[in-house]
Amino acid sequence: MSKVGIVSWGAYIPKYRIRTEEVARIWGDDPLRIVDVYLVDEKSVESLDEDAVTIAVEAARRALKRAGINPKRIGAVYVGTESKPYAVKPISSILVDALGLSNNVFAVDMEFACKAGSEGLVAAIGLVESGRIEYGMTVGTDTSQGEPGEHLEYSASSGGASLIVGRDGVVAELEAVYSYVSDTPDFWRREGSPYPMHGEGFTGEPAYFRHIIGAARGLMERYGYKPSDFAYVVFHQPNGRFPVRAASMLNIPMEKVKPGIVVTHIGNTYNASALMGFAKVLDIAKPGDKILLVPFGSGAGSNAFVFTVTELITERQKSGVPTVEDMLRDKIYIDYAQYLKMRKMIKLFE
């Protein structure tokens, strides 16, 4: 029986961008210092008619188009997000109708901060491996928010990425998966609060690095992998510095990490962050390449996956679906006033 793996991928990045220097200008920060601290030059901003739902729909449509399969063959759809437009109403059920999926489908919105989308990947893999479904889909989508004037505003951005899992037409076979989770209060948002809070010193060592390194190193030790085995390594990207440092801690050369870095150009897309980097790598990967994917979610936890690219990757890369690199280049810059308007941050009270 053929291995389970990635059958297709799709991504969507809103074309609007705001430069770090524009945000810094408004708040009186030194733009050169801010860029140096976060290694984020600009970030993506959703338009007035976009939200986590529309972004998810577009990313998923592109994954379906690239796969060339009948949407009715999708047996499960999972959505990971921190930006639900509704407090009570799933995005996954909207995708069922928007994408033309069968009504006999498992549909769930997942929650685990920025790794909820990768939890959907784990769930889809499990259902396909069990034989319960033929294909499964996961989508990571967010229009992440940072409080005006707070440093999270420099990186919190918008985007979506989707993966389709199956046994037939696999472009990247799953070889291994590993998880590392603990109760770590690094980042949270209480009910009714418009913006999240973060635990300052908890966001680095106790949260991101402990769990990213724990998952990646744990996987390598359990399954006997070495850094030299991987052609590409993709980490969650809250800023430009963290994935670089994680690579250094694992003795992974930068040339294996750099191709999957997107945060410098679009900021932190939360649930789409690692999956977007993975999509960017799949756009250029060659048969035989091994890819290590390590998403992270605050609260906190990481999943680590190893995939091996198959001969079918070349065919999927010629599908005509926009690549991540295409979307990184397709952009329109806006100023801070337009940014506030598009993000619906201007509130009118009667």
Curated annotation (Swiss-Prot):
Signal peptide: none
Similarity comment: Belongs to the thiolase-like superfamily. Archaeal HMG-CoA synthase family.
Function: Catalyzes the condensation of acetyl-CoA with acetoacetyl-CoA to form 3-hydroxy-3-methylglutaryl-CoA (HMG-CoA). Functions in the mevalonate (MVA) pathway leading to isopentenyl diphosphate (IPP), a key precursor for the biosynthesis of isoprenoid compounds that are building blocks of archaeal membrane lipids.
Protein name, entry field: Hydroxymethylglutaryl-CoA synthase
Subunit relationships: Interacts with acetoacetyl-CoA thiolase that catalyzes the precedent step in the pathway and with a DUF35 protein. The acetoacetyl-CoA thiolase/HMG-CoA synthase complex channels the intermediate via a fused CoA-binding site, which allows for efficient coupling of the endergonic thiolase reaction with the exergonic HMGCS reaction.
Keyword terms: Acyltransferase, Isoprene biosynthesis, Transferase
Entry's EC annotation: 2.3.3.10
Binding-site list for (3S)-3-hydroxy-3-methylglutaryl-CoA: 30, 114, 155, 203, 236, 245, 268, 298
Entry GO MF terms: acetyl-CoA C-acetyltransferase activity; hydroxymethylglutaryl-CoA synthase activity
Organism expressing this protein natively: Pyrobaculum aerophilum (strain ATCC 51768 / DSM 7523 / JCM 9630 / CIP 104966 / NBRC 100827 / IM2)
Record: residues binding CoA: 241
Domain of life: Archaea
Pathway it works in: Metabolic intermediate biosynthesis; (R)-mevalonate biosynthesis; (R)-mevalonate from acetyl-CoA: step 2/3
An individual GO BP term: isopentenyl diphosphate biosynthetic process, mevalonate pathway
